[in-house]
């Protein structure tokens, strides 16, 4: 039986400290470039989620109107999509089980706002943005069914 042995010089045994330092520096440079771009994404994701929720609520309200011939009043609110509302306008043909399973919270964990009649259309569905105040810019801007394409 023949045994083969390899002769390794100390230079071939592994990475040198300089090679490791070069790799760490390169990774640091890449992180410095990438991290600022990635850090802005949570705000964009929250805005996108808000727009998607508002579209879904608007679709559910349109189905509600098809069944009941009118949108729920401001007082009945979005809760009319989950539970049969009382009062006017009467929901004569309210769909058993509701129009949504549950009402979503806005991306900042507050309830979505609903107005009928709306300021911007027949109905308004909106969130007041990160600051919870009317108006604002960027992440603080209001997101409503009237501004989904902006």
Question: Which role fits each region the language model picked out?
Answer:
Residues 2-4, 44-47, 59-62, 68, ...:
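Short, surface-exposed interaction loops/tails
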Residues 32, 40, 44, 66:
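Short, conserved catalytic or interaction motifs in soluble domains
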Residues 37-55:
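Aliphatic-rich helix starts adjacent to a transmembrane/signal segment
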Residues 78-96:
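Acidic, glycine-rich loop-and-strand cores that form catalytic or ligand-binding grooves
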Residues 11-38:
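N-terminal single-pass transmembrane signal-anchor helix
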Residues 35, 40, 76, 83:
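Phosphate-coordinating loops and pocket residues in cytosolic domains that bind phosphorylated ligands
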Residues 24, 51, 58:
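Conserved catalytic core of two-component sensor histidine kinases
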Residues 1-15:
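N-terminal leader/signal peptides at the extreme start of proteins
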């Amino acid at each position: 039986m023949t045994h083969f042995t390899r002769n390794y010089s100390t230079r071939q045994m592994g990475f040198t400290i300089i090679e490791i330092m070069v790799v760490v520096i390169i990774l640091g440079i890449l992180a410095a470039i990438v991290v600022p771009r990635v850090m802005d994404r949570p705000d964009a994701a929250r805005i996108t989620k808000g727009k998607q929720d508002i579209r879904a609520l608007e679709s559910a309200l349109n189905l509600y109107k098809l069944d009941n011939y009118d949108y729920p009043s401001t007082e009945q609110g979005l809760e009319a999509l989950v539970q049969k509302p009382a009062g006017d306008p009467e929901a004569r043909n309210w769909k058993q089980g509701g129009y949504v399973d549950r009402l979503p919270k806005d991306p900042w964990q507050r309830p979505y706002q609903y107005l009928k009649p709306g300021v911007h259309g027949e109905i308004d569905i909106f969130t007041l943005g990160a600051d919870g105040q009317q108006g604002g810019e960027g992440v603080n801007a209001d997101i409503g069914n009237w501004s989904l394409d902006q």
